[in-house]
Structure formats: structure tokens, C-alpha cells
Amino acid sequence: MEWETVIGLEVHAQLATKSKIFSGASTAYGAAPNSQACAIDLGLPGVLPVLNREAVRMAVKFGLAIGAEISPRSVFARKNYFYPDLPKGYQISQYELPVVGLGKLEIELEDGETKVIGITRAHLEEDAGKSLHEDFHGMSGIDLNRAGTPLLEIVSEPDMRSAKEAVAYLKKLHALVRYLEICDGNMQEGSFRCDANVSVRRKGTEKFGTRAEIKNINSFRFVERAINYEVERQIDILEGGGAVVQETRLYDPDKGETRSMRSKEEANDYRYFPDPDLLPLEIDASFIEGVRGTLPELPDEKKHRFMTHYGLSAYDAGVLTASREMGDYYEAVVKACGGHAKLAANWVMGELSAALNKDNREITESPVSAAALGQMLERIEDNTISGKIAKDVFEAMWNGEGSADAVIEKKGLKQITDTGAIEAIIDKVMADNPGQLEQYRSGKDKLFGFFVGQVMKATGGKANPGQVNDLLKKKLQ
């Protein structure tokens, strides 16, 4: 029997505001526990919430970027449930009237095709605090610094049919919120986290299967593993004659499996009702147009421009526009190296990315600036150094040994381009290797590489490879 996987994702993006959604308390990460929780966050009597305008602006910005309808009137509701890190006994969220309506996001599949994933809604809500179970023996501690931090919950349609599609959607969404500068996307710190709703059904049927919700998955790799495990688990149950239970599950990355957390609640379990302390949110057209004017060039637009303007392949353009910072760095390199777009792409995706990954740095933390890398690429183009020597120059620059010109001068790496000097070295190599010379002239063409290698070795890699090839061809005839 063939089964079809059905996946919908709920993503919580922590908005990059300086203060909380309903109070003036700071949202800075890493402060001492409970040092950033004010009377409103603590749920003390007699205090009233005041909506953060910047959080609304960021939500509208996201809605415009996904081509969604912005609700002129939305309502905040109380979502009632008990949890130790929820001081009020309810969470302020949105239910029937969210700020952002239907939208969509286009993802690329592995075969190069594209697929549109529907976005049902995006609504504003406050985050809860944090329960700390490992720091206290036999007890749990509560840190309310995170309570009241603004979240944008982005709910997709159940349009994904594999774990890989879900990861592609999640990565696209992650890049988008970072491009918009509404969320820093830091998954380790919980700024961007995902709940996956997973079910299976017989292929060809319209009715959805019973879904399980996997909570708070905080890496792309874990999302793929958690979904794949859950799909196999549900298929095993159904093929064994059992029934899948609707429940909330947690993914255990150490064991690579999901485990039951609690039975899945329905909306009526939360007893939603409009928050009497908050007026309905009215958004007029002028506010929306003002936000529209702040939209940056979006990832798909930038990718298309890189392909048409710089002549890059779809793959290269996709890699270079994966983050706003990467795209900006690349364009600065192209400008600094005189417009050699393909050479710049190769170096940014190659040596630079490898060095960043090795040192676990973001591109904004690169010790080699875009201008400095561009200057080095110019030295390749004007034949001052070869591409091979450039790798040594780049390593020295990365280690703080100065600019490309300074490193080339200090280490004596300038390429030998004097024809007479190269010819003299070729003559010596030929004289030192009479056996190989005779074999080459007898038709053993593969030995050409041997002679190139000997010349490059004799010059310490500093001879111009193109000149060496041309001169050797003439000399070896």
C-alpha cells in the first residue's frame, strides 16, 4: 500500500523589537534570569498592556512580502491554559481575526522545479517564559525574561508532501525574515522555532489522516529527521492495524525519535475570547503603504537580478542570495574587483565560505573585508599572482597579515611574467629530463603535465601558468 505524507508547519519568529509586545521591558537575550520582567510580564494586578507599534509594523512588513492580505481590523484574544512559566494564566494571541491573512511562498525542489506553499495566516502573540529543569536538583526554576517577547506565528497550509519540502520551505522562510530584518533567525537561541504537523493517508484519498504535532524543533536537520521518523512511526501503526492518536510529541535528537508529550488540544480547550484590556487593532491604508515603502529587495528578486546582471547560474545565484549579508558582501567584492562577477562568485562560495565554516563565523564577522578580497582578485586578473598563489595570499590575509599587496610584497609572491626568464627555466627543465623529453616527442602527450609541474616547481609556483603552457608547447615541438 502506498502512503502520502501531509505536512503543515507553524513557525514562531521572535520579532527583533527592542522592547516587549505589551510592555517596555527589554528583549535583549542572555540577561540574568528575571532581570527583564516588569509588572505586566509578571501578570501583577492593576497593570494594563500597551501594544508595541514596531511589532505591528514588522508583522505588516512580513505580510506584504508574502503577498498576503493585511487585515484592516484584527483582534487580540486570551488563550487560556496553565503552565508555570505563564504568570497570567493566559497568553495574549490572535485567533479569529489575525493581522496577516492568506499568502504564499515559492520553494525550489531538488529536481529544479518550484512549488507554491500556501500560508494560512500570520498572527501576533506574546512568548511565554522559560522553565529550567536542569539547574535545580528535584525542582524547576522559572525565568520570565522571555515572557512578553513579541512573536509572529506563521501557519502554513498542509501543502508539503515530504520532509525535504518542509525543510526547503523553512529555509526560505528563515531567509525571508532575515532579509526583512524582522527576526535574527537564531535557532539556537530560540528566535526561530518550528512545530510540525504530520499525518499520512492512502495515496489518492482526499481525507487527511490523524495528525501529530511535533513541538519546538530548532534546527533544519532535526526538522527533517523528526518528520521522517514520525512518518515511519505512523505508517507502522496503520499497517499493523492500529490507529494514530492525535497528540503533541517531542523530538529527541539524541535518540533520533519522537515521543509522546500530551494529547493534542483543540481550539475550544483554550477557551479563546477577546482580550478586554486591548482595543481592536485598526490598520489604515496609509500605514500599510508606509511599510511597503521600506521593503528591501527580496531573495527571489535578488536571485533573478544576479542571474541576469552578473550572468550567474541559478545554483550560484541561489547560494549567494541565501542571506542578505552574503548577497551584499558578494556585490561589494564584484565592485571592488572591477566587475569580474564569476571570479568573485567562485571565491565567495569557495575559499571564503570554507574559511567561515572552519572558524564558525558569520560573513559579517569575516576578517577579510569585501574590499580587501576584491583587491586580491584584481591581482589575479592583472597577472600579479596566479589563482594557486592567491590561496596562500588569502590565508595570510585571513590571519591578519595585511592587505593582498602587502602580503605579495612581503612574501615575494609576485608572478613571474618575464618571457625570457620563463624560457630559461623551461630550457633547464628540458635539459634535466632528456628521457621524458624523448618520450613526449615520441607521442606520449600526457607528459606535458609533467613538464608544466617541473617549471612551476622550479619557480616556486610563481610563473604565470598560461605563459608556461604557451611557451612549453612551442619549445617541446
Swiss-Prot record:
According to the UniProt entry, what is the EC number of this protein? Answer: 6.3.5.-
Q: Which GO terms describe its biological process?
A: glutaminyl-tRNAGln biosynthesis via transamidation; translation
Give the reactions, separated by semicolons, that this protein catalyses. L-glutamyl-tRNA(Gln) + L-glutamine + ATP + H2O = L-glutaminyl-tRNA(Gln) + L-glutamate + ADP + phosphate + H(+); L-aspartyl-tRNA(Asn) + L-glutamine + ATP + H2O = L-asparaginyl-tRNA(Asn) + L-glutamate + ADP + phosphate + 2 H(+)
Q: Which PROSITE patterns match?
A: GATB
Q: Which GO terms describe its molecular function?
A: asparaginyl-tRNA synthase (glutamine-hydrolyzing) activity; ATP binding; glutaminyl-tRNA synthase (glutamine-hydrolyzing) activity
Keyword entries, A-Z: ATP-binding, Ligase, Nucleotide-binding, Protein biosynthesis
Which InterPro entries does the protein's record reference? Answer: Asn/Gln-tRNA_amidoTrfase_suB/E (IPR017959), Asn/Gln-tRNA_Trfase_suB/E_cat (IPR006075), Asn/Gln_amidotransferase (IPR018027), Asn/Gln_tRNA_amidoTrase-B-like (IPR003789), GatB (IPR004413), GatB_C_1 (IPR042114), GatB_Yqey_C_2 (IPR023168), Gln-tRNA_amidoTrfase_suB_CS (IPR017958)
Q: How does it assemble?
A: Heterotrimer of A, B and C subunits.
- Family statement drawn from the similarity comment of this UniProt entry: Belongs to the GatB/GatE family. GatB subfamily.
What function is annotated for this protein?
Allows the formation of correctly charged Asn-tRNA(Asn) or Gln-tRNA(Gln) through the transamidation of misacylated Asp-tRNA(Asn) or Glu-tRNA(Gln) in organisms which lack either or both of asparaginyl-tRNA or glutaminyl-tRNA synthetases. The reaction takes place in the presence of glutamine and ATP through an activated phospho-Asp-tRNA(Asn) or phospho-Glu-tRNA(Gln).
Protein name per the record: Aspartyl/glutamyl-tRNA(Asn/Gln) amidotransferase subunit B
Q: Which organism is it from?
A: Thioalkalivibrio sulfidiphilus (strain HL-EbGR7)
Gene from which this protein is expressed? gatB
